[in-house]
Curated annotation (Swiss-Prot):
During oogenesis and spermatogenesis, expressed in ovariole, germarium, testis tip and testis. HEAT repeats lie at residues 129-166, 238-275, 314-351, 393-430, 466-506. It is found in: Cytoplasm; Golgi apparatus membrane; Cytoplasmic vesicle, COPI-coated vesicle membrane. Residues 512-526 have a biased composition (Low complexity). InterPro entries: ARM-like (IPR011989), ARM-type_fold (IPR016024), Clathrin/coatomer_adapt-like_N (IPR002553), Coatomer_bsu_C (IPR011710), COPB1 (IPR016460), COPB1_appendage_platform_dom (IPR029446). One of its GO terms (biological process) is positive regulation of innate immune response. GO terms for cellular component: COPI vesicle coat; Golgi apparatus; Golgi membrane. It is a peripheral membrane protein. This is Coatomer subunit beta.
C-alpha cells in the first residue's frame, strides 16, 4: 500500500533540522495558533518526504482539529489527504472515525468557503468507509444558497459515483433533477459534465430540451456540450443531423475556445463544403483576432491539417484572401506559416488578387523598421518567386516590384530576387527583354558586391541585340573613369577626376538656383556649439570634402580589395564582346568595342597591382582576367563556346535538377498521405502496430495517445508496439546477480522515462530496495525513485524521469541498494548511453540559408574520415544513415565517379537547434581498392551539438572499421 501512495510534491528541508516527534507533539498541544500553523507545515513536509509519524494523528485530532482558524483548516485538508489512513493490514485506522465526524461538521459549517473546500477535498479520498457516513451531508450541499458550495458538491458526487457507485446509486437522477432547476453556469457545467460521463442519455435529453438556448450559455458549459456532441456523433453517426445545427451556432460564440473546439468538431462530423468553409473561416477569424502568437500558430496548424485533406483543400482555395489577412500579425513565424499555407491554396482564379496583396505588403516594408523586417522582405520575395514560377502569367507584374529590392540594404532579400530573376529569365524567354530593362535601371543603385556580381552574370548571359551597348555603358558608369590608376592618382593629388567634374556640373545648376532664391546667408546654417553659442557653417565648404571620397560602386569594391567582382565583370564583358561580334558585321565596330572591353580588364589588373586598394588582387582573380583577355585576343572556337553556350546550359541543367528534386519530394509526400480504400481490412488496435489516423479520427483518443507518447514526431506505433519496446531494452545487471534489472528507455521531446524492471532472484525478502541513479552530461534527474519491498522471487516496475535540455550525448549510471535480514548490499548497474540521434531529425533549407547559417555559427568540429569504405557514394549513404541528416546537394550533382565528392548536410534537433555538415572526401580513380579519405566539418550554434555530432560520426566510423 505504501508504494501506491501518490507523492504530489517534494519539498527540500535543510539537513541541519533535527526532527523530534516529542517536540512536534508539544508544539501541537501547547503552542499558540501561529506555532501550530508552523508545526503543521513541518509535519506535512516530513510526510511528503516519506517520514511516518503515526503517533501524531491523535494529537492533531485532539488539539488542532477543533481550532477554528482558516489557515489551519486549509493545512488540515492537506494533512488528511497525505497521511496514511490504514494500518499495515489494510484496515482503516480507528482514529479516522473521529476525523470523519469533523468532516461532517465542516460540511454543515455556515461558512461557504469551508464547505466548498471540504467538498473538493472529499474528491481526493479513496476510502469508501470514510465517505459513506458523509453522503447525507454531501447531498444537502446541493441545495446550498451559494454556487461555490453547489458546484463542488456536484463534483464530489461525480467523483464518488465514478469510484464507488454503490454509495450514490441514484447519482445520475439526482444530478439531472439538479440540472433542471439550476441557473448558475458553473453548477450547470459540472452537472452536465457528470451526466456526459455517467449517463449520456440523460445528458442528450437535457441538451435536446434546451438546444435553442445553447448560444446563451456560458463558455464553460458550451465546451462540455461540444464534447458531448462529438462523442455521441462519433459513436452513433445517425445523430449527426440532430446536433450539427447546434455546432454551427456555437461557431458564433463569444468565447474563442468554444469557437475553436466547435470548428474542430464540425469538420469531423461533416465533410460538406459548407461545413468545411464555415470551420476554416472560423479558424481564420481566430488567427486574425487572437493576440497570442502561440494560439495563432496552433490554429494555423489546424488549417494546414485541413489543407492536407484532399476533399477540404478545394473548398479552402476560395479562402486564400482571408488567409492573407493574417499577415497583419507582426510575428515572423506566423507570417511564414501563413504565406506557406496561402501558396499551397492559391490557384489561377485568385493568383492575381494574391499578388496585389503581396505587392502592398512589400510597399509597407519600406516604411517600417523592425528587427524582423529584413526576414519578412525575404519571405515576400520567395513567395512572389514561387507564385511567378507556378503561374507564369503574373511574372510580368511581379518583376518590377522585386527588382526594387536590389537596391535594398538587406542582402538576403536582394540575393533571393536575383535567384528569382535568374530562374525567370531562363524559363520565360518572352520576358527577357523586360527583365534586362529593369535590371539595367536598377544596376547603379545596387549597394552590395555580392548582388552586383550576380547581376553582372545575368546581364552578361542573357542580354541581346542593342541592349549589349546599354549594358556596357551602365557598367562603365558604375565603374568610373578608365584607366583607374591614373584617375586615383589625380584624386590623390587633389585634381578633379571626370566623375567629380560631372558631379560638380550637375550640382552647379542646383547651387545657382538656390543662390538666386536666397540671400548671402541662405547657403549657411546655424549650429549650436558645446558652450551654447551659435556657430555658422557653410554647406558649400563641407560638400566637396564629403564628395571627394565618394566613388562609383564597382570602383569602391575594387578599392576595398574585392577583385572577385573584377573577375566576374571581366567574364561578363568577354561574353558581351563575343556576342556583339556575332551581331555586328563591321570589323571596325567590333574592334572598337573589344579594345574598350580589354582596356577595362587591363585597368582592373593594373589597379590590383598598384597598391591603391586596401588588398592586392589575388592570383586566382588575375588568372581569370588573363583568360578573358586571351579569349578576346585569340578567339578560339572552344573558348568562344565556353563563354557563349556552356554557362547557360549549366544553369539550365541545375534548374532542371532542382525541379526534378522538388517533384520527387512532392511524390514522396503524396505517397505518405494515408488513403483508405474501400477494400482495406478493418484494423483492431490490439492487433496492429498503429496507423496514421484520418482527419475524422476520435480526437480525444488521439490526444490522449499523443500525451502518452510524449514526442511530437513519434508515431503511435513507436510507443504501443511491443516489438519497438524490445529493441530499446537495456540490460542493467547480469542474470547471476541477486537482483536482476533491465530498463526500457523511452525518449520523449523534453525528457527521458526509464521504465526499470527489478526482479528479486533470491529466497529472501528485500527491504528498502532502492534504485539510485546519477547522470553525466546535460541531463538532470527529476525525482528520486521511492524504495520498495520485494518478496522472494517477486518483481516490480520503477519509473524514473530524466530531464533533457539540449542535444548532447549523456550517460545515466547508478546502482541498486537493498537490505536483507543480515546486511545491506549494492548491485552496480550498467551505464545507459543516451544517443543524440534520438533528438535529431532530417531537415531541409535553401543554399542561401545554409551559407548564412554556416557564416553565423561559431562552433566548428572537424572530423577526419577514417573508414573501410572504398566507394564515395556508399560512404555518403552510411554517413546520412548514422547521423540522421539530410543531404542538401542534389543527387545529379553527386552522380558519376570523378574521385572527389563534396556535399552539404543539414538536420534540426527537437529543441530547435540547427546542425550543418560539409563532407569533402576523395579517393584515387585509378585505384579501386583504395579507401575513402577526407574530412567532415560540422558547424552548430552550441558547442555541445557540434561535439556530440562529431562523436557520433567517429563512433560510426569505428564500427564500420571493426565490421570490416
Amino acid at each position: 500500500m505504501t508504494s501506491q501512495v501518490p507523492c504530489y510534491t517534494i519539498i527540500n528541508s535543510p539537513d541541519l533540522e533535527v526532527t523530534n516527534e516529542m517536540q512536534l507533539k508539544r508544539d501541537l498541544e501547547k503552542g499558540d495558533t501561529n506555532v501550530k500553523i508552523e508545526t503543521l507545515k513541518r509535519v506535512i513536509k516530513l510526510l511528503l518526504n516519506g517520514e511516518r509519524y503515526p503517533g501524531l494523528i491523535m494529537t492533531i485530532i485532539r488539539f488542532v482539529l477543533p481550532v477554528q482558524n482558516h489557515t489551519i483548516k486549509k493545512l488540515l485538508l492537506i494533512f488528511w489527504e497525505i497521511v496514511p489512513k490504514t494500518s499495515a493490514d489494510g484496515k482503516l485506522l480507528q482514529e479516522m472515525i473521529l476525523v470523519c465526524d469533523a468532516y461532517r461538521k465542516d460540511l454543515q459549517h455556515p461558512n461557504e468557503f469551508l464547505r466548498g473546500s471540504t467538498l473538493r477535498f472529499l474528491c481526493k479520498l479513496k476510502e469508501p468507509e470514510l465517505l459513506e457516513p458523509l453522503m447525507p451531508a454531501i447531498r444537502a450541499c446541493l441545495d446550498h444558497r451559494h454556487s461555490y458550495v453547489r458546484r463542488n458538491a456536484v463534483l464530489a458526487i461525480f467523483t464518488i459515483y465514478k469510484n464507488f457507485d454503490w454509495l450514490v446509486p441514484d447519482g445520475p437522477e439526482l444530478i439531472a433533477s439538479f440540472l433542471d432547476t439550476q441557473q448558475d453556469m458553473s453548477c450547470k457545467r459540472n452537472a452536465f459534465l457528470m451526466l456526459l460521463h455517467a449517463d449520456q442519455e440523460r445528458a442528450l435529453n437535457y441538451l435536446a430540451s434546451c438546444i435553442d438556448q445553447v448560444h446563451t450559455f456560458g463558455d464553460i458549459l458550451q465546451l462540455v456540450i461540444v464534447e458531448l456532441i462529438y462523442k455521441v456523433c462519433h459513436a452513433n453517426p445517425a445523430e449527426r443531423s440532430r446536433f450539427i445545427r447546434c455546432i454551427y451556432n456555437l461557431l458564433n460564440s463569444s468565447s474563442n475556445a468554444v469557437r475553436y473546439e466547435s470548428a474542430g468538431t464540425l469538420i469531423t462530423l461533416s465533410l460538406a463544403p459548407t461545413a468545411i468553409k464555415a470551420a476554416a473561416s472560423c479558424y481564420i477569424e481566430l488567427v486574425v483576432k487572437e493576440s497570442d502568437n502561440n494560439v495563432k500558430l496552433i490554429v494555423l496548424d489546424r488549417l494546414v491539417a485541413m489543407k492536407e485533406h484532399e476533399g477540404m483543400e478545394k473548398v479552402m482555395q476560395d479562402l486564400v484572401m482571408d488567409v492573407l489577412r493574417v499577415l497583419a500579425a507582426p510575428d515572423i513565424e506566423v507570417r511564414r506559416k501563413t504565406l506557406a499555407l496561402a501558396l499551397d491554396l492559391v490557384y489561377s482564379r485568385n493568383i492575381g488578387e494574391m499578388v496585389l496583396v503581396l505587392k502592398k505588403e512589400v510597399a509597407k516594408t519600406h516604411n517600417v523598421e523592425h528587427e524582423d523586417t529584413g526576414k519578412y522582405r525575404q519571405l515576400l520575395v520567395r513567395t512572389l518567386h514561387t507564385c511567378s514560377i507556378k503561374f507564369p502569367d503574373v511574372a510580368a507584374n511581379v518583376i518590377p516590384v522585386l527588382v526594387e529590392f536590389l537596391s535594398d540594404t538587406n542582402e538576403l532579400a536582394a540575393a533571393d530576387v536575383l535567384i528569382f530573376i535568374r530562374e525567370a529569365i531562363q524559363k520565360f524567354p518572352a520576358l527577357r527583354a523586360l527583365i534586362i530593362e529593369h535590371l539595367i535601371e536598377a544596376f547603379p543603385q545596387i549597394k552590395s558586391s555580392k548582388i552586383h556580381r550576380a547581376a553582372v552574370w545575368i546581364l552578361g548571359e542573357y542580354v541581346e541585340g542593342s541592349q549589349i551597348l546599354e549594358v556596357i555603358a551602365v557598367i562603365q558608369q558604375t565603374l568610373g573613369e578608365v584607366p583607374m590608376v591614373e584617375a586615383e592618382q589625380r584624386r590623390l593629388a587633389g585634381d578633379q577626376t571626370e566623375e567629380q567634374k560631372q558631379q560638380q556640373g550637375s550640382a552647379g545648376g542646383n547651387a545657382a538656383g538656390s543662390a538666386a532664391e536666397g540671400s548671402g546667408s541662405g547657403n549657411a546654417s546655424n549650429k549650436v556649439t558645446s558652450d551654447g553659442t551659435y556657430a555658422t557653417q557653410s554647406a558649400y565648404s563641407l560638400a566637396p570634402v564629403a564628395k571627394a571620397e565618394k566613388r562609383p560602386p564597382l570602383r569602391q569594391y575594387l578599392m576595398d580589395g574585392d577583385f572577385f567582382i573584377g573577375a566576374a565583370l571581366s567574364a561578363t564583358l568577354t561574353k558581351l564582346a563575343l556576342r556583339y561580334a556575332e551581331l555586328e558585321t563591321e570589323a571596325r565596330a567590333q574592334n572598337r568595342l573589344t579594345t574598350q572591353v580589354m582596356l577595362i580588364m587591363s585597368s582592373i589588373l593594373h589597379l590590383g597591382k598598384s597598391g591603391f586598394p586596401s588588398k592586392p588582387i589575388t592570383n586566382d582573380d588575375t588568372d581569370r582576367i588573363f583568360v578573358c583577355l586571351r579569349t578576346l585576343s585569340e578567339r578560339t572556337p572552344e573558348a568562344i563556346s565556353v563563354f557563349t553556350l556552356y554557362c547557360r546550359e549549366a544553369l539550365g541543367k541545375m534548374l532542371d535538377a532542382q525541379h526534378d528534386e522538388d517533384q520527387r519530394m512532392l511524390k514522396e509526400k503524396q505517397k505518405a498521405t494515408a488513403k483508405v480504400q474501400p477494400d482495406d481490412p478493418v484494423l483492431f488496435a490490439q492487433l496492429s502496430n498503429g496507423r496514421d489516423n484520418q482527419l475524422g479520427e476520435n480526437v480525444f483518443e488521439s490526444s490522449l495517445n499523443q500525451a502518452l507518447a510524449g514526442s511530437k514526431n513519434a508515431q503511435l506505433s513507436d510507443v504501443a508496439s511491443p516489438n519497438s519496446k524490445l529493441n530499446k531494452v537495456t540490460q542493467l545487471t547480469g542474470f547471476s546477480d541477486p537482483v536482476y534489472a533491465e530498463a526500457y528507455v523511452n525518449v520523449n521531446q523534453y525528457d527521458i522515462v526509464l521504465d526499470v524492471l527489478i526482479v528479486n532472484q533470491t529466497n529472501d525478502t528485500l527491504q528498502n530496495c532502492t534504485l539510485e541513479l546519477a547522470t553525466l552530461g546535460d541531463l538532470k534527474l527529476v525525482e528520486r525513485p521511492h524504495p520498495v519491498v520485494l518478496a522472494p522471487h517477486d518483481f516490480c516496475n520503477i519509473k524514473a524521469n530524466v530531464k533533457v535540455s539540449s542535444t548532447e550525448n549523456g550517460i545515466i549510471f547508478g546502482n541498486i541498494v537493498y537490505e536483507t535480514a543480515l546486511n545491506t548490499n549494492v548491485v552496480v548497474l550498467n551505464t545507459i548511453h543516451i544517443d543524440i540521434m534520438d533528438y535529431i531529425i532530417p531537415a531541409s533549407c535553401t543554399d542561401t540559408e545554409f551559407r548564412q547559417m554556416w557564416q553565423d555559427f561559431e562552433w566548428e568540429n572537424k572530423v577526419t574520415v577514417n573508414t573501410s569504405f572504398t566507394d564515395l557514394h556508399e560512404y555518403l549513404k552510411h554517413l546520412l544513415k548514422s547521423t540522421n541528416m539530410k543531404c542538401l546537394t542534389p543527387e545529379k550533382a553527386l552522380s558519376g565517379q570523378c574521385g572527389f565528392m563534396a556535399a552539404n548536410m543539414y538536420a534540426k534537433s527537437i529543441f530547435g537547434e540547427n546542425a550543418l555538415a560539409n563532407l569533402s572526401i576523395e579517393k584515387p580513380v585509378d585505384d579501386p581498392d583504395s579507401k575513402v579519405t577526407g574530412h567532415i566539418r560540422i558547424r552548430a550554434k552550441s558547442q555541445g551539438m557540434a561535439l556530440s555530432l562529431g562523436d557520433k560520426i567517429s563512433s560510426s566510423q569505428k564500427q564500420s572499421v571493426q565490421a570490416a
